[in-house]
Each structure stands twice: as C-alpha cells, then as structure tokens.
Amino acid sequence: MTDSFYRYDVIVIGAGHAGSEAALAAARTGAHTLLLTHNIETIGAMSCNPAIGGIGKGHLVKEIDALGGAMAHAADAAGIQWRTLNASKGPAVRATRCQADRSLYRAAIRQMIEGQARLNIFQAEVDDLLFEGDTVCGAITHTGLHFKAPAVVLTAGTFLAGKIHIGPTQYAAGRMGDPPATMLAARLRERLLTVARLKTGTPPRIDGRTLNYTAMQEQPGDAPRPTMSFIGNSASHPPQVSCWITQTTERTHEIIRAALHRSPLYSGQIEGTGPRYCPSIEDKVVRFAEKNSHQIFVEPEGLNVIDIYPNGISTSLPFDVQLELVRSIRGFEQAHITRPGYAIEYDFFDPRGLKASLETKAIAGLFFAGQINGTTGYEEAAAQGLLAGLNAARHVRGLSSWTPRRDQAYLGVLVDDLITHGTNEPYRMFTSRAEYRLQLREDNADARLTAIGRDLGLVDDARWAHFNAKQEAVARECGRLSALWATPGNALGREVKETLGVTLSRETNIIDLMKRPELDYAALMRVPSLGPGVDDAQVAEQVEISVKYAGYLNRQSEEITRQQRHEATAIPLEFDYAAVRGLSTEVLQKLQHIQPQTVGQAQRIPGMTPAAISLLLVHLERMRRNRVA
C-alpha cells in the first residue's frame, strides 16, 4: 500500500448515526475522509428502537436535513408507519415520527456513504489514537495499521468499555453481538479527560407471529403521510403497516417486584446512570408503584422480518423473569422471545470539556459526537455528528468553526446545554429545552439553516434550487394575498360571506382575515376569487404560520436581538478569570472549569449572577481598550 492510503484530512471512528453524518459532512465540505468501523455490515444500524423522530427529536432530524444531512432521506426510504405527533397543538411542538424498517434504513445510509465523493470506508477496530503532544494526528487499528489525519472524530456510541447486563450475567460488549472498544477506552482514560459511566437498555424482541393482536388496540399511521426530508416524497415510502398498543397487567408488576433482588439495577451491579425519560420496566414499577399498568407500543422492526419491538419494557432482569413478565402482558400470553432484553454500561466524557465546535479542549483536532458526550438517541447523535464532521473539516483547512446559536436551532440548544451544564444522565432533546421554540419549528428548519448550510458547503445544488423555489413560492403567495381586500359590499366580501359565513363590517385585507382563529389558509382558498391557492403543502403551511403567528414571532425576534449582544461577546480561550476582581470563589471556580466561549454562555452557567456578568464585561472591555492602545 502507498503512503497516501494511510493519510487523510479527517478520520471518523464509528459508523453509527453520529459517525455516518460526521463522515458525510466532512466529505461534502471537501475533506478527504476515512470512516473506520469494526463492521461494514452495521453501518447506520439502529441498535435499539426502530423509529426516527418524535417530540424534539423530529426537530433535530429536520435541521440535519436542512443542512444537507442523511438521516431524513434514510427515514423516508425506510419509514413503514408515519405520524405527526401533537398535530392538534401549535406548530412549535408538532413533530414527525416514523416507524422504520431496520434493513431499509441501514441500506439507505450505506448507499449514501458509498456514493459520497472523497469518503473511503475501512473495516477495522481502533485500539488507540496517535498524538503529537496535545494534538491528535491519527488512529491505530487492532492489527497495527497507522492512519494519519490532523482531525479525528470519535463516535464510539456504547462501545467504550461497554458491558452488557442480563440479570447477574455480565460481559464485555459494545452491543449484543459486537465487541467493545476496551483498549481505546483505556487509552482515552489516560488523557486529560473527565470520564464517567452511563447505562441504557433495550427490551426483549418478540416473534410477531406468536402475538394475539385481537387483544390489542390498533394504531394505524396518518393519512396523508408526512415526510421527514424537505425534499422527500411520500410516494417513495415503502408499504405501510400498523403498530399496536397493549398494557402490562397487575400480574406483570407482581413478577417484577418479586424479582427486583435479581435485577442488576437494584443489586448494585450497574453503576452507570440510566435515561430518565426511557426508564426500564422495573424502574417504572418501582417509581410509579400506584399504577396498575403501563402502556406498551408494539412496533414491527421491518416488512420482511418477524421481530417485534415492545416499546416500554426495556429490562435487564434475568431471562427467566423476562419470559414470565412478557407472557403476563395482554396479547403476549404465547409470546416467543427471539432476543433477550439487556442493559449496557459504557464510558462517556464530561461534555463541559468540549468547545462549541465539539472539539475537545484538552486535545487539539479531536472531536467527540454522540453518546460519548452523554446524549441518548439516534437523532441527538446524528445532529452532533454532522456538526463535528463539519468542524473537523474546517479545522483542517484553518477555517473558523460554526455552531448554531440557541435561537437558530435545536442543535444549538443541544450543544450549549452539554458544554455549559454537562450531564450526569443520558441527555434527550425536548421542545421544552428551547427558549425560542416558536422560532425553532420543524416546518421552518430549512428557512433557518439551509442558506447557512450552503455557505458552509454542506448543501448541494439540487437542495439549494428546491429551497429557493419554495421560498419564492411562499413570498409570492403572501404578496398575492396581501394585495387583496374584501369589503362588505364588494364581490370578494360577498364571496367570503357566502362561502365561509363571515360577515365583514369594514374593509379587510385577506392577510388580516387569515389571522382570525376560526379561519385558515385552506378555508380561505375555498372562496372562488381566492382559490385554489398553492398546491404545495409545505408552501401553504409556511404562508399560514407566517401570517397567524406574525405578532408572536416579531416579539420573540426582538428578544433574540437583545440577547445577541452577549452571545456575540467572545471570551478568549486563554482568559484569566482570576484577574477579574470581585468574583466569588464559587463563580470563579465554575468559570475556570467550564471556560465559556462567550458571555452569553457564561450567563447560562448555573449559579452565575448578574453582578458576575457585569464584572466580566467590564474586564473584557478593559482588555479591548488596552489592545487598542
């Protein structure tokens, strides 16, 4: 092999959701990229639940898509059931979710990776990283191959010192059927990085042919179906299926309570903290002892497999207990388990040791993304991966990094939460984490981010053309409607009364008419002189939201502008906080530990006071004047 085989601009380690997006983003922006994975066949694998999207998570997928990422495309190629969650609520909290065929999803991701220019794949376990002082310069495989690169993105998922637990049985693994990255974990622990343990879990898988669906409630998908990608088409979705809903029983809870002493969660065997919002069934039975049943979503794992994912009964109880509790569930009386549920513990690193670019502060050129940063979920991992891959490529070219602000994207909220507050439990995205969620809707992710993505080199010509055509259509339709006026006596006013039963008392612009709670775009388009309107549902939605929520959006924009002063005030990396007179010991220690990159980030550190921020601003201004002088 020639020397060029081993030299790259960016190396990405791990090919799950974070690694796939990282490698694609780096290569799309021009970096010669190597994706190292222990098994090419598991690229893009959905290790736990077979679904993409949901509350907060769907927002992240739309943002990934707006920035040219892969996840939404793969979801559209694999989605076998589609739903819009919170459809009856406001647009800020509506979210798209799809049940996905695991095989189709994995195939879609692999196809995109294999088709990406400047991106090579190599199958190898990575045992160590190469360093020159405090700078990363490559990776060493289990077989001793040395790959060189000035930037490395580590997306190890649950593989770093991973340990599976099923009852008292425990063994080293990255996930069931895959080896852990034990050597790499040990080497990383030797560096100046703060490491801790987290845990997650998964339910037993069931042979769907052994279930009694007549005892369950059918949950069909939505019609018409949404799409995940802004440039997706529901006509390209695979065949659709139903999910089902059932419940645990009092007998289920009795079985679990009687076996708690055998649970690694309660015996002290597991040290890592589990996800608060996706607890195991034994955790739910203990924490919500007053409940007689818990809901279970019965989700098919694909069109051509027998496996069912029983969402809601993640467990690490011994297998004999798993079998008994599964068969106590309504409709599961004859269930055959194909794979046991288990918990897995793994290493993660305190994300407060990261810059906003997701580069580690301790090691130049080393970027972390995904569960290694303390998050849980495919969507959270993929969003971080895209950002880390982009910034790794920019690092190599000597360009400044880019991270969205909290008011620009849920990705910005995610990163800021992690690097400012850290986490001691798996972090999951919710819409409630964002202060500006009316601005950060699923439907406008492209309007927020696609132009930025184009400037960064992430967005290709086809997506850019589609985006511009959509924006022009929205502006054109808003302009058309704003030019139309209805009066009690003119023809349009009479049509409005006859069609909609709305009697006008004065001259009214059609835009103002749409602001009324009882009217929407679709209703107005039934008026002969107004309709039929645009036939693109995305354009119609943008027109309606921009009109109905204009007042709220304008007020939130003004608030964001006020906050921007602090967000734009950078703090030098080598800043000496001890030189700021008047800071309390507590505040000083927090600033020295977190090393915020902007005054805005410093403001969000728990325990930070307005007085401390004022002192910080005064000192920064004094430094600026001294430099000028």
Swiss-Prot record:
Gene Ontology terms for molecular function: flavin adenine dinucleotide binding
Cofactor: FAD
InterPro entries assigned to the protein according to its UniProt record, in alphabetical order: FAD/NAD-bd_sf, GIDA_C_N, MnmG, MnmG-rel, MnmG-rel_CS, MnmG_C, MnmG_C_subdom, MnmG_C_subdom_sf
Subcellular localization, as worded in the UniProt entry: Cytoplasm
GO biological process: tRNA methylation; tRNA wobble uridine modification
Annotated positions binding NAD(+): 274-288
Binding site for FAD: 14-19
One Pfam family named in its UniProt record: GIDA
Family (UniProt): Belongs to the MnmG family.
HAMAP family: MnmG_GidA
Protein's name according to its UniProt entry: tRNA uridine 5-carboxymethylaminomethyl modification enzyme MnmG
Gene: mnmG
